[in-house]
């Protein structure tokens, strides 16, 4: 056969080589009926062919070359497992891919013609031959694998044995069931596409490249077997029967014909039963038809061929009955089946146990496989092992106490654990399972890839040190578990987000990052660790950029440095890594050929120009201008900043609190960073690292959630940034700027001592709970809110209380309140009284002045406490109140000036000193209805003084019914101003010309109810006064100590309720006199009580002491006497008349006498009529304050209660050998003989005196006293009262006595 050769420049060898130009073609007639007569050409895709008639044809009429390459390389939108993928075409329309999780093409080798099937095996086409460069030497990631043997089957299926376990992928471990009929295959492997279930397969390869555009083919014959140009598509399986699978490469618009060089590449189908991708076969050839159609032919998966080769290179070692398996001089002994034929075989151990090397063991291409969930110990002094690697399958654990050969790399796969306990002095490559580093500098370097492996530290200095600490995270990375150890890095050599630094130990780790130049970490950080970046001095160009993610509840600490958190520019395939180069002299450079990258870019220049998307063809993995960025989530406890810069860039979601000192914080930074080597950072054989960082402007959405505490710092929130301050914001000497386009929401309150500049949106709300109800939040700005742009918006709603002046010269917007809000939106965690005091019953309260003459304000359900002259262009007020008041720095009257006012159902409360007042001036237009004017009197009005004080002015022809006068409760009075409307030539005015005042009965009643608390506390002490003496009549002891605890609740009208816990302790002694027994004693008491009503609540703590005596005559008569003093500390909060919270002390005295007669019906039963009289003294109190500018006072004088009680008790005793129990019940009537004290109220309407009232009630009780032995007694009593204005709802009395 004639062979034609030509000289070609080789990019691989860098010189000239001889290349055969011979092309092979086989022609035949199609089988079948004559009407389907066709001419076909069958071409083995591994043969070199000069013609492009059979070359790859990526159809780029409406798709980009990069789409096909992203497809095969799992880049861009084509991530493994992704669903609902839509490709945006050049014309702007989209193509939705079949409805199936996108395949993981990692089993496909770099050159595309072989596919890993797990372990040290791969598949290809037989016609590629063993010596073909893509078969003899196979590459995945940064690793090179040599073929050592292969096995083939008809027609063209081959499986290779490699010299190492492949660590970059688990491989395509299963094939399709080729015995199925086409219909059965459709059911099992079919997927939905465009509304129909079809037998669709996915493929990837890197054969000779050409592109087809609008029917015209452009060849790039010099491009083949280039890993960067790996490309793919999905195809339709037309024929499943027979010994070949035929696919239609052109059945859809996203078509890419399999090409020369694609021979052996795998065809993947989705197994709907196993929910995974499996291999249907490998490319054998292509059929080209006379009508231009094209089919690819695939040799079917052959499991028998695979198993035969695996069996050839496997040796099973059952250690179930062996204590130790010994390997010496290449011979295995001690397992009951000793052999010397183990060279190049995988030794597959089962049963667990010890493996002893008595000499170094070079197993060639064979590895050590541990095949069950057992523990194995590999020992051997200083002997070494060399081979394909270690495979810890099925959760097995291997304790590695030998060394690996230092001239080779140890490959580790399998989901189990390799526990390395000796320094290895070599490199590790791992892709699966766990490797424990249990020695200092366990490995020289570690290459971790595929995302399924973990390396765990288990010794100090377990990593080798150096700039990267000897660990390199290649494609899809893996996990480094610090395991409680601290670790420092200058740079972490990570190529993508699959790299993870974590700490799974309960002992916290510290991860220190000490880069000395700008550096991007593409990976993730999580677990129980703190992150530190501390420098002695601050300098530029030493920025740490995180574009992967952080997930920890711990802290990050920065000192004298810069940190950026941002998203990651989505990586895409490139045509070539690096620029075009030619080493030949100038006269011979034509031999180097053309720059194929420039040629490919030229084919798509028109689409790029039309769509403005140069990033599609710029041969860069990413570009600042591209629209697709991956969002990074950064979650931490607190970020501590000291003299540092922190920025949140595009596509970042940051969750955590910030504490800053002398630092700069930017949220929504427009500066972004990309790495032109991202995804390809790891170089050489896996132990090198590179980065090429480009910075520039690029904006995308930014999210921040958390709180900020900052001192002497700056905060800038930029366009497209959304900040949710869910925790408190504290800004001391810190200027905050919200730029145009920024959206900021605060929920938990804020304090600032500096101006807050707003060009974007600031919303202040209450703090929501899980039911979306709100706790009130306070926003206090000691400076001002500056609205610096026409688009600026200041919003407050949902229980926000805002304090601070507002200034603007722009057409900004102020929106306060929520028209659907009411108290029902309060969180159940909130005191309604507190909310009422803070918000005044409105949705929002605002205290401050507004100087914004060009701005518009909307107030719904808002209480505006206006503290200074204010101006607005427009104000719309609904269901709100404008309350003119003073501030610490401004005691003057104020004027609110508005060009246009639309007001409905609102109130305007103004102050007057009877000669001047606050004013509302409307310049251009006033409209509305149902609005009221209220007037606070700073001085007491006198009826004889004539008033004429202008309150409101508006343009003439304004409806005079916009405002009307309304009564206002001030203090204890209802004050109704007399408002007179007058119209002149240019305006209409509403003026105060008088007032009407009447007492407010409800406020008066509330004041009396509050002051009656002391009487009710006195009454509770009375009810507990004589309890001790009643006990004495049921005991016979001489002397003793006793204790009593009583708890009760009471109620009265007006929503009043109280509860108390009263504790008494004391001692007493019995004196036997002629005809009577006399007991004398001393007691001390402590009482905790609380009381509440509709308009007040509070608590009282009381302590007291007293003396008592009880005389019991032998005839059954008795008399009890007691004297007692009690001191009370009170704290009460009232919501009427602006009283607020008051702390005050009072005291009371008690003198009581009770007489009665115990008549014994039988020896063990008795009836006891009784009468009691208690006289006392209760100290008075006085409060003085101002309500809405009016002076008020409340006072009650000392008074002397006198309370009587009559009643009868009955009882019966039950006794045994050494015990006695007395049961009793009582019924009584208690009544006041003197009225309670008088309360005096004073306000603008004068003085009001409220006389005290008498009360009475019926008392009921039941109880038990028990005597155990001679000296221990205890009792229990239950009480209740009825028919009184105040009643004891229930009370429990427990006592204990010890006699001595």
Curated annotation (Swiss-Prot):
Record site: Cleavage: 1023-1024
Keyword Hydrolase carried by entry: yes
Autotransporter domain ranges (all copies): 1034-1300
InterPro entries for the chain: Autotransporte_beta (IPR005546), Autotransporte_beta_dom_sf (IPR036709), Autotransporter_pectin_lyase_C (IPR012332), OM_autotransptr_brl_dom (IPR006315), Pectin_lyase_fold/virulence (IPR011050), Peptidase_S6 (IPR000710), Peptidase_S6_dom (IPR030396)
EC number of this enzyme: 3.4.21.-
Alphabetical keyword list: Cell outer membrane, Hydrolase, Membrane, Periplasm, Plasmid, Protease, Secreted, Serine protease, Signal, Transmembrane, Transmembrane beta strand, Virulence, Zymogen
PTM comment, free text: Cleaved to release the mature protein from the outer membrane.
Signal peptide boundaries: 1-55
GO cellular component: cell outer membrane; cell surface; extracellular region; periplasmic space
All copies of domain Peptidase S6, residue ranges: 57-311
SUPFAM superfamilies, sorted: Autotransporter (SSF103515), Pectin lyase-like (SSF51126)
Active site per database record: 127, 156, 263
Remaining remarks: Encoded on an unnamed 94 kb plasmid.
Comment block on domains: The signal peptide, cleaved at the inner membrane, guides the autotransporter protein to the periplasmic space. Then, insertion of the C-terminal translocator domain in the outer membrane forms a hydrophilic pore for the translocation of the passenger domain to the bacterial cell surface, with subsequent cleavage.
Name of the protein described by the UniProt record: Serine protease EspP
């Amino acid at each position: 056969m004639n062979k034609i050769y030509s000289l070609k420049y080789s990019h691989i060898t860098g010189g000239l080589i001889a290349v055969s130009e011979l092309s092979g073609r086989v022609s035949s007639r199609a089988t079948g009926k004559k009407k389907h007569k066709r001419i076909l050409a069958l071409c083995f895709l591994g043969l070199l062919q000069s013609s492009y008639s059979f070359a790859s044809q990526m159809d780029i009429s409406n798709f980009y070359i990069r789409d096909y390459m992203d497809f095969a390389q799992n880049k861009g939108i084509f991530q493994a497992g992704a669903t609902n993928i839509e490709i945006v075409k050049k014309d702007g329309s989209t193509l939705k891919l079949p409805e199936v999780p996108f395949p993981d093409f990692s089993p496909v080798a770099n050159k595309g013609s072989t596919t890993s099937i797990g372990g040290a095996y791969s598949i290809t086409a037989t016609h590629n031959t063993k010596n073909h460069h893509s078969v003899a030497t196979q590459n995945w990631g940064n690793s090179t694998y040599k073929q050592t043997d292969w096995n083939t089957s008809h027609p063209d299926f081959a499986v290779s044995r490699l010299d190492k376990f492949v660590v970059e992928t688990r491989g395509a471990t299963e094939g399709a069931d080729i015995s199925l009929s086409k219909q059965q295959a459709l059911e099992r492997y079919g997927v939905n596409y465009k509304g129909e279930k079809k037998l669709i397969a996915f493929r990837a390869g890197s054969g000779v490249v050409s592109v087809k555009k609008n029917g015209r083919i452009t060849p790039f014959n010099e491009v083949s077997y280039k890993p960067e140009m790996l490309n793919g598509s999905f195809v339709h399986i037309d024929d499943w029967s027979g010994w070949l699978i035929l696919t239609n490469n052109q059945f859809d618009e996203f078509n890419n014909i399999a090409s020369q060089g694609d021979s052996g590449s795998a065809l993947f189908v989705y197994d709907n039963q196993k929910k995974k991708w499996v291999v249907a076969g490998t490319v054998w050839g292509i059929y080209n038809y006379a009508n231009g159609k094209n089919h690819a032919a695939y040799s079917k998966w052959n499991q028998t061929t695979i198993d035969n080769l695996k069996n050839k290179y496997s040796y099973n070692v059952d250690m179930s009955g062996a204590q130790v398996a010994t390997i010496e001089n290449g011979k295995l002994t001690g397992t009951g089946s000793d052999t010397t034929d183990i060279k190049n075989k995988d030794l597959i151990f089962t049963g667990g146990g010890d493996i002893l090397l008595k000499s170094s063991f070079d197993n060639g291409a064979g590895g050590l496989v541990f095949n069950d969930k057992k523990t194995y110990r590999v020992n051997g002094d200083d002997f070494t092992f060399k081979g394909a690697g270690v495979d810890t399958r099925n959760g097995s654990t291997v304790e590695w106490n030998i060394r690996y050969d230092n001239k080779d790399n140890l490959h580790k796969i399998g989901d189990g654990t390799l526990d390395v306990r000796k320094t290895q002095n070599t490199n590790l490559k791992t892709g699966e399972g766990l490797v424990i580093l249990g020695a200092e500098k366990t490995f020289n370097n570690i290459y971790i890839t595929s995302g399924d492996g973990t390396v765990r530290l288990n010794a100090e200095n377990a990593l080798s040190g150096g700039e990267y600490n000897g660990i390199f995270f290649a494609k899809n990375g893996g996990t480094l578990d610090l395991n409680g150890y601290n670790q420092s890095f200058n740079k972490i050599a990570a190529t993508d987000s699959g790299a993870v630094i974590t700490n799974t130990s309960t002992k916290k780790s510290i991860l220190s990052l000490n880069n000395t130049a700008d550096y991007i970490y593409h990976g993730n950080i999580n677990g129980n660790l703190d992150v530190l970046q501390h420098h002695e001095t601050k300098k530029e160009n030493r920025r740490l950029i995180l574009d992967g993610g952080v997930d920890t509840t711990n802290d990050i600490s920065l000192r004298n440095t810069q940190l950026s958190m941002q998203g990651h520019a989505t990586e895409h395939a490139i045509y070539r890594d690096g620029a075009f180069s030619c080493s030949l002299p100038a006269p011979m450079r034509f031999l180097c050929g053309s720059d194929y990258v420039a040629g490919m870019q030229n084919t798509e220049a028109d689409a790029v120009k039309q769509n403005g998307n140069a990033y599609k063809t710029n041969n860069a993995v990413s570009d600042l201008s591209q629209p697709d960025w991956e969002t990074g989530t950064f979650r931490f406890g607190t970020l501590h900043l000291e003299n540092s810069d922190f920025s949140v860039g595009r596509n970042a979601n940051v969750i955590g609190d910030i504490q800053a000192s002398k630092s700069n914080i930017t949220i929504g930074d427009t500066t972004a960073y990309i790495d032109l080597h991202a995804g390809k950072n790891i170089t050489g054989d896996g132990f090198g690292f590179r980065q090429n960082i480009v910075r520039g402007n690029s904006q995308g959405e930014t999210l921040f959630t958390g709180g900020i505490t900052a001192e002497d710092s700056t905060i800038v929130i930029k366009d497209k940034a959304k900040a949710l301050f869910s925790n408190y914001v504290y800004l001391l000497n810190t200027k905050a700027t919200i730029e145009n386009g920024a959206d900021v929401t605060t929920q938990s309150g804020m304090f600032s001592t500096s101006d807050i500049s707003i060009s974007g949106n600031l919303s202040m709300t209450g703090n929501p709970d899980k039911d979306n109800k709100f706790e009130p939040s306070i926003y206090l700005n000691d400076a001002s809110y500056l609205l610096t742009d026409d688009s600026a918006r200041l919003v407050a709603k949902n229980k926000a209380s805002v304090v601070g002046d507002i200034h603007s010269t722009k057409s900004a917007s102020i929106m306060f309140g929520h028209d659907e809000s009411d108290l029902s939106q309060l969180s159940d965690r909130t005191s309604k009284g507190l909310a009422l005091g803070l918000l005044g019953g409105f949705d929002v309260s605002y205290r401050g002045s507004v100087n914004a003459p060009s701005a518009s304000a909307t107030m719904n359900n808002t209480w505006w406490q206006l503290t200074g002259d204010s101006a607005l262009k427009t104000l719309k007020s609904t269901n709100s109140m404008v309350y003119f008041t003073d501030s610490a720095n401004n005691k003057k009257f104020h004027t609110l000036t508005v060009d246009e006012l639309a007001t409905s159902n609102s109130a305007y409360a103004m102050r007057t000193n009877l000669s001047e007042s606050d004013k509302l001036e409307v310049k251009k237009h006033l409209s509305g209805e149902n609005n009221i004017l209220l007037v606070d009197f700073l001085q007491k009005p006198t009826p004889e003084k004539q008033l004429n004080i202008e309150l409101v002015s508006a343009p003439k022809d304004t409806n005079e019914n916009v405002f009307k006068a309304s009564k206002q409760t001030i203090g204890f009075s209802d004050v109704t101003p007399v408002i007179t409307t007058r119209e002149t030539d240019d305006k209409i005015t509403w003026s105060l010309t008088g007032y009407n005042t009447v007492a407010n009965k409800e406020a008066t009643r509330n004041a009396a109810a509050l002051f009656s608390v002391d009487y009710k506390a006195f009454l509770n002490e009375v009810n507990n006064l004589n309890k001790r003496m009643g006990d004495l009549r049921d005991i016979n002891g001489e002397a003793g100590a006793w204790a009593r605890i009583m708890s009760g609740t009471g109620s009265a009208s007006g929503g009043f309720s109280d509860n108390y816990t009263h504790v008494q302790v004391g001692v007493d002694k019995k004196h036997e006199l002629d005809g009577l027994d006399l007991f004398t004693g001393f007691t001390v008491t402590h009482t905790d009580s609380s009381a509440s009503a509709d308009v007040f609540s509070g608590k009282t703590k009381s302590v007291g002491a007293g003396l008592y005596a009880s005389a019991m005559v032998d005839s059954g008569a008795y008399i009890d006497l007691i004297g007692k003093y009690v001191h009370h500390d009170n704290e009460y909060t009232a919501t009427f008349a602006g009283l607020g919270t008051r702390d005050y002390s009072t005291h009371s005295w008690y003198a009581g006498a009770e007489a009665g007669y115990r008549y014994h019906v039988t020896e063990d039963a008795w009836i006891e009529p009784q009468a009691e009289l208690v006289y006392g003294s209760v100290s008075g109190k006085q409060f003085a304050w101002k309500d809405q500018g009016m002076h008020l006072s409340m006072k009650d004088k000392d008074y002397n209660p006198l309370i009587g009680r009559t009643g009868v008790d009955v009882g019966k005793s039950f006794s045994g050998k050494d015990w006695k129990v007395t049961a009793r019940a009582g019924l009584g009537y208690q009544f006041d003989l003197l009225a309670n004290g008088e309360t005096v109220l004073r306000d603008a309407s004068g003085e009001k005196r409220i006389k005290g009232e008498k009360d009475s009630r019926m008392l009921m009780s039941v109880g038990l006293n028990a005597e155990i032995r001679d000296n221990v007694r205890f009792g229990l009593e239950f009480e209740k009262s009825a028919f009184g204005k105040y009643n004891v709802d229930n009370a429990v009395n427990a006592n204990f006595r010890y006699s001595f």
